[in-house]
Design a protein with these regions (language model features):
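N-terminal Rossmann NAD(P)H-binding glycine-rich loop of SDR-like oxidoreductase domains
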Residues: 4-24
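C-terminal substrate-binding subdomain of Rossmann-fold SDR/epimerase-dehydratase oxidoreductases
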Residues: 20, 203-325
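Conserved glycine-rich Rossmann-like NAD(P)H-binding loop of the short-chain dehydrogenase/reductase
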Residues: 26-35
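Rossmann-fold cofactor-recognition segment
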Residues: 42-54
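Conserved Rossmann-fold NAD(P)-dependent oxidoreductase catalytic core, especially the SDR/UDP-sugar
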Residues: 99-146, 172
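NAD(P)-dependent short-chain dehydrogenase/reductase
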Residues: 125-134, 158-234, 247-249, 257-262
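Active-site helix of classical SDR
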Residues: 148, 152
Length: 325
């Protein structure tokens, strides 16, 4: 039995990863600034620590840990990342967490780290055409992310790779593309497009507002495929970043239509000004396929069915709780 540490275990992906690692038979320690909002953690130990504080990281990382999965970050959807109001917090908070973890790994002799980067680190000039975005791994430079969130992710990629070169860390890095599924943020201002649109459709009486023209495109990776990819990349010999996302691209208006079909509702789309991000983003999976012999499957419909059902249930419970309060 190996001892695993999941930083960010109180978050959406981290919570699912803890469960998966336990199912594999590992002893799992979870850490986060908050408890998971929607489930009781499956971790053997959970520490509610602010990982920006070096003293907390010093207590958390011990020499008997086999692998650290570093998912902890200051993050959110377009309404959080692209307004500009949170740029300093995003840069400072996430950078401090990664600097603390990398330094303490060296001090304690812990070698293995898995870092979740993001497709947000890709240059904005390669994502202006909604029909033909360029997001192959080698297109990352010259660097020009469209947000401070993306710049920090790029910095931390280089941080872990430099610690691998100079201090012997075994770093594995995945650039995640719009991961979605149950048990994630859906109504707190940090939710991403699939969850936000599932909520809007579920609450709709005929019309919903969608930020931007709706022709902007994205690909979306269901959480089960994300967790599978994390395990496969971590077990591989690949020491450079790999895309982890779906190659199926869909417009935001198209995503609304797909969710509406799943919900069996007729919904009119009202496109309004709002935080937008790039016009086109889609995973390019040739390198991950060539490197580890695997790439995510297209589970968009299935994933949206599961996510919509979960969010609808959450809405119903919130209404019921409000009536009995």
């Amino acid at each position: 039995m190996k001892k695993m540490l999941v930083c960010g275990a109180g978050g959406f992906i981290g919570g699912h990863l803890v469960t998966s690692l336990k199912q594999q038979g590992h002893y799992v320690i979870g850490a986060d600034i908050k408890q998971h909002e929607y489930k009781k953690t499956d971790a053997d130990e959970f520490y509610q620590y602010d990982l920006r504080e070096q003293s907390n990281v010093r207590k958390l990382i011990t020499s008997d840990i086999d692998t650290i999965y570093q998912l902890a970050a200051d993050m959110g959807g377009a309404g959080y990342i692209f307004t500009g109001n949170n740029d300093a917090d995003i840069m400072h908070n996430s950078a401090m967490i990664n600097l603390n973890i990398a330094e303490e790994m060296v001090k304690k002799g812990v070698r293995n780290v898995f870092y979740t980067s993001s497709a947000c680190m890709y240059p904005s000039h390669n994502q202006e055409d909604p029909d033909n975005p360029l997001l192959s791994e080698e297109s990352a430079y010259p660097a020009n992310p469209d947000s401070e969130y993306g710049w920090e992710k790029l910095f931390s990629e280089r941080l872990y790779m430099s610690f691998a070169r100079n201090h012997g860390l075994r770093a594995r890095i995945a650039r995640l593309h719009n991961v979605f599924g149950p048990q994630g943020s859906w109504n707190n201002g940090k939710e991403k497009a699939p969850a936000a649109l599932c909520r809007k459709v579920a609450q709709s009486t005929g019309e919903i507002e969608v930020w931007g023209p709706g022709v902007q495109t994205r690909s979306f990776l269901y959480i089960d495929e994300c967790i599978e990819g994390i395990h496969r990349i971590q077990a591989s010999d690949c020491g450079f970043p790999l895309n982890l996302g779906s190659e199926r691209m869909i417009s935001i208006n198209g995503l609304v239509e797909l969710i509406s079909t799943i919900a069996k509702k007729s919904v009119k789309i009202n496109n309004v000004p709002g935080p937008l991000g790039v016009m086109g983003r889609n995973s390019h999976n040739q390198l991950i396929h060539d490197t580890i012999g695997w790439a995510p499957q297209d589970n968009l419909e299935y994933g949206l069915e599961q996510t919509y059902a979960w969010i609808s249930n959450m809405i119903e419970h919130n209404i019921a709780d409000a009536k009995t309060a």
